Design a protein with these regions (language model features):
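Extended, charge-rich alpha-helical interface modules
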Residues: 1-240
Length: 240
């Protein structure tokens, strides 16, 4: 399990990384920005990370993106990294800075800059004092639920279990403990025998909805796997 300090530091870096990735597009926070303005902002983000003492903790992949100058043509590979925004809530929930994890039915769009006090008055020590870690049991439960969502997407897309009985498949693959997790979980319908999003079972979702759910569940599971293991950020291996 990662320490409170490690989790908070990683969340801060991820938010700065998300800001950098967003600069690949001309529209930033609803305002059209010139190439020079976006490059200036990229440098400002890097300087802020260095000044606050976070730059030494960024991963190799992140460093390559932070140090890549903004070009006229958007880098699609960098834009894909914006999916990491789904990693924020798992970390902030574990730190006690956000009350609960959002449902899996839509992307998280909340602005976490105020939560992490981004800006000139930012203080890691002050933020750390505000953090109150939830229990290991709660974290493990969140992780296992995210894993089941991730598995359900894989099953839906690839028919891994070749079964229409989702609970039976979960029992056969993961065991009784994972069935018990679903008993009081609001996004699992025992009658429909499936996870529910926006009133539809996963089986009823169209391709775009399944793809969105895949991104949400995969990124959240990635965050929880990092939280609960000794793996470095770029080296987390997802196994279902």
């Amino acid at each position: 399990m990662k320490s409170k300090e490690e989790i908070l530091r990683r969340a801060i870096i991820l938010l700065a990384f998300s800001d950098r990735c967003a600069l690949e597009k001309e529209m930033v926070d609803g305002v059209r920005r010139s190439l020079d303005e976006r490059e200036m902002q990229r440098k400002a983000i890097v300087n802020w990370l260095m000044r606050m003492g976070y730059y030494d903790n960024i991963s190799l992949k992140e460093k390559q993106v932070f140090e890549k100058e903004i070009a006229r043509k958007a880098d699609k590979d960098i834009l894909v990294f914006q999916n990491n925004y789904e990693c924020f809530e798992p970390m902030l929930v574990c730190l006690g800075l956000v009350k609960e994890l959002s449902g899996y039915d839509k992307f998280v769009l909340d602005d976490f800059h105020p939560v992490l006090n981004f800006g000139k008055n930012h203080s890691f020590a002050t933020l750390l004092e505000r953090c109150c870690m939830i229990s290991d049991v709660q974290i493990e439960t969140y992780r296992e639920i995210s894993m089941l969502w991730y598995w359900r997407c894989l099953e839906c897309r690839n028919r891994i279990s070749n079964s229409t009985d989702i609970k039976e498949a979960i029992y056969n693959i993961f065991g009784e403990n994972h069935i018990s997790l679903l008993h009081n979980y609001s996004q699992f319908d025992a009658v429909a025998n499936d996870f529910i999003l926006n009133g539809k079972t996963v089986t009823e979702l169209n391709n775009a909805e399944v793809e969105r759910l895949s991104v949400i569940s995969e990124r959240r599971l990635y965050a929880f796997e990092w939280l609960t293991t000794d793996e470095e950020w770029d080296e987390v291996d997802l196994v279902c």
